[in-house]
């Protein structure tokens, strides 16, 4: 393991941490060269457990023989760039989460069909662009038994830095895939693929034809896809029209909606396979 003391972040090797945008890190033109950033020893360890390849670390000096020692022992070939906390804060402009960042190679993408052959309960996300919500949804999906998460092409990347952090690494534990290559593939193309895989689809939406989330018919479905929409407007009408069910969560005190991550958690628990 090579440890390099730094005094500035202008060297090209540190560009993933300091200069590259999320889009540049993802590298859509050459996805095999894509990178993501994992933060904190716990999240980095979860990514390593999932087989992700570490490229380098940026961390406070005290982390090397402290909380990061365990993950560093698993990455003997990775370069570690280090400095004191005060230096890193000045250079990066923010405090590192738990003092450790790791640049890692993006895993090879999978198709929905590869992931969902034996799945019984999956989450399908439409147009969710808030990375905090993406991370929270993945954490709920992992905790509450979803077999996979599928995303419309307009969703935020689950491997963007904040989504990875908020998910507490569960983006590496729950299989996920994007339903199509462009927004034009959703909803018609994506819904057709879900139905071809044998899923009944349940749109979480306020609608006159909506059934309650505790409707017995939902629990009898062998393969059910729970479809969640954007933070503001929810699912588009065309998506709802393509779904087999429209489902609502009964609420009290005049509340008519929940944050999408909270609504997802309720739906995942109530509609889990039993």
Residue ranges of model-derived segments:
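Short, aromatic/basic amphipathic alpha-helical patches
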Residues: 66-77, 239
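A glycine-rich helix N-cap at a beta->alpha junction
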Residues: 74-93
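Active-site/ligand-binding-proximal alpha/beta "capping" segment
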Residues: 202-253
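Short acidic-hydrophobic, aromatic-tinged amphipathic segments that line or gate anion-handling sites
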Residues: 3-10, 79-84, 175-186
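RNA substrate-binding interface of SAM-dependent RNA methyltransferases
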Residues: 107-209
């Amino acid at each position: 393991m090579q440890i390099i003391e730094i005094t500035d972040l202008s060297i090209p090797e540190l560009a993933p941490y300091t200069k590259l945008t999320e889009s540049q890190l993802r590298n859509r033109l050459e996805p095999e060269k894509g990178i993501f950033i994992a933060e904190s020893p716990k999240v980095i360890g979860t990514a390593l457990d999932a087989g992700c390849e570490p490229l380098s670390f940026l961390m406070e000096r005290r982390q090397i023989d402290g909380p990061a020692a365990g993950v560093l022992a698993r990455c003997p070939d990775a370069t570690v760039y280090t400095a004191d906390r005060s230096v890193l804060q000045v250079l990066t402009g923010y405090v590192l989460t738990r003092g450790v960042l790791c640049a890692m190679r993006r895993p090879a993408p999978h198709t929905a069909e590869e992931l969902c052959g034996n799945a019984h309960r999956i989450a399908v996300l439409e147009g969710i662009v808030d990375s905090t919500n993406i991370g929270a949804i993945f954490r709920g999906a992992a905790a509450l038994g979803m077999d996979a998460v599928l995303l419309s092409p307009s969703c935020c990347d689950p491997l963007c830095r904040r989504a990875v952090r908020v998910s507490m690494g569960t983006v590496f534990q729950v299989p996920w895939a994007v339903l199509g290559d462009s927004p034009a593939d959703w909803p018609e193309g994506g819904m057709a693929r879900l139905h071809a895989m044998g899923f009944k689809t349940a749109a979480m939406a306020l609608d006159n034809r909506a059934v309650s989330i505790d409707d017995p018919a939902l629990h009898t479905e062998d393969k059910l896809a729970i479809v969640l929409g954007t933070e503001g407007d929810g699912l588009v009408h065309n998506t709802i029209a393509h779904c087999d069910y429209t489902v609502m969560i009964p609420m009290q005190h005049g509340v008519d909606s929940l944050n999408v991550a909270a609504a997802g958690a309720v739906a995942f628990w109530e509609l889990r396979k039993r």
